[in-house]
């Protein structure tokens, strides 16, 4: 899977990295700091298909970041924590293709420091629940069979009922997750697209059907689940495709148990949009005109976005999703 594996030299003899390297079975290349090489020169995003390198490093600087408005449900503070850079999947709309200078993966291993910062943040908000989201810069489950950090974050939730951790994912890699007990404040949230859309643009990801099967398995075992319909992309038979997706979820009794469902229409920064045009010139992402929007992102016009999200919201309500659990993600007046 990996072309080369780089490890920061001060981490080589640590137990966590030794365990990780034994699973990878790859001779590491030592370096002082991962950013001596990573991102120093432009590596085209699609080169990940042939030569994907792995860097194992210590995350320095800010370990938690305050999430922007409309990132999660309103009323409580939301942060995201950075456990990795880049993703093994290849979704045509992914903003990472214009965010970093390289698609190579970085896995950060200083989870105890991240958890300490979480604890400090929790103490700074003594009367509130505080949300911590994983999956902003990398899928939160895809490589957990290698990294083995889930138990640490699970224990943090067990010991801190006011903390809510959300693992955002498109993965069906739940091997490590199934070793843990369900907790109400340890939420696994799945990004889902209608089957036709997923096949067209969620490249190298588990299918929508596979994700639904995993959600069903986790639900049967009592795990807390949520879903993201984000990005919502317009295409012919748009309404029918979301009806079919929600019916599939309803058949598995998933719609009524969701902690929440977020709805967000496809959007890009200007730089990411240029990369998408370059990397996927024939994508259905380009089939509907977009404009520069309220936050300088490239999106469909406002009436169209509202119509799309309200259409999907009505379908979700009909399928049994709780109205107070549905919110609009990264949208004005959300």
Annotate each PLM feature.
Residues 1-77:
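Flexible, acidic/Gly-rich N-terminal and inter-domain linker regions that tether
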Residues 4, 129-133, 164-166, 185-189, ...:
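Structural preference for beta-strand elements that scaffold enzyme active sites
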Residues 1-17, 247-334:
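Auxiliary Fe-S-binding modules of radical SAM enzymes
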């Amino acid at each position: 899977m990996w072309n080369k594996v780089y490890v920061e030299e001060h981490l080589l003899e640590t137990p966590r990295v030794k365990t990780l390297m034994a699973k990878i079975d790859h001779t590491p290349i030592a370096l002082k700091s991962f950013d001596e090489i990573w991102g120093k020169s432009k590596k085209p995003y699609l080169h990940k298909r042939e030569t994907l390198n792995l860097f194992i490093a210590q995350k320095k600087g800010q370990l938690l970041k305050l999430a922007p408005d409309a990132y999660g449900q309103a009323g409580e503070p939301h942060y995201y924590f950075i456990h990795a850079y880049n993703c093994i999947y290849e979704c045509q709309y992914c903003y990472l293709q214009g965010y970093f200078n390289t698609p190579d993966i970085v896995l950060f291993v200083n989870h105890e420091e991240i958890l300490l910062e979480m604890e400090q943040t929790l103490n700074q908000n003594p009367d509130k629940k505080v949300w911590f989201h994983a999956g902003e810069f990398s899928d939160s489950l895809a490589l957990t069979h290698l990294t083995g950090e889930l138990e640490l974050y699970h224990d943090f939730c067990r010991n801190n009922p006011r903390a809510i951790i959300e693992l955002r994912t498109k993965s069906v890699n739940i091997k490590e997750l199934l070793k843990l007990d369900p907790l109400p404040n340890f939420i696994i949230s799945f990004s889902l697209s209608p089957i036709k859309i997923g096949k067209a643009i969620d490249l190298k990801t588990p299918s929508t059907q596979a994700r639904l099967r995993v959600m069903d398995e986790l639900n049967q075992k009592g795990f807390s689940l949520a879903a993201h319909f984000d990005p919502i992309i317009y295409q012919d038979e748009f309404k029918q495709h979301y009806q079919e997706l929600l019916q599939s979820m309803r058949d598995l009794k998933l719609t009524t148990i969701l902690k929440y469902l977020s709805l967000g229409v496809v959007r890009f920064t200007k730089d990411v949009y240029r990369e998408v045009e370059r990397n996927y010139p024939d994508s259905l992402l380009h089939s509907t005109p977009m404009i520069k929007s309220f936050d300088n992102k490239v999106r469909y016009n406002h009436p169209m976005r509202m119509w799309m999200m309200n259409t999907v919201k009505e379908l979700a309500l009909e399928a049994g999703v709780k109205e107070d659990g549905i919110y609009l993600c990264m949208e004005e007046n959300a």
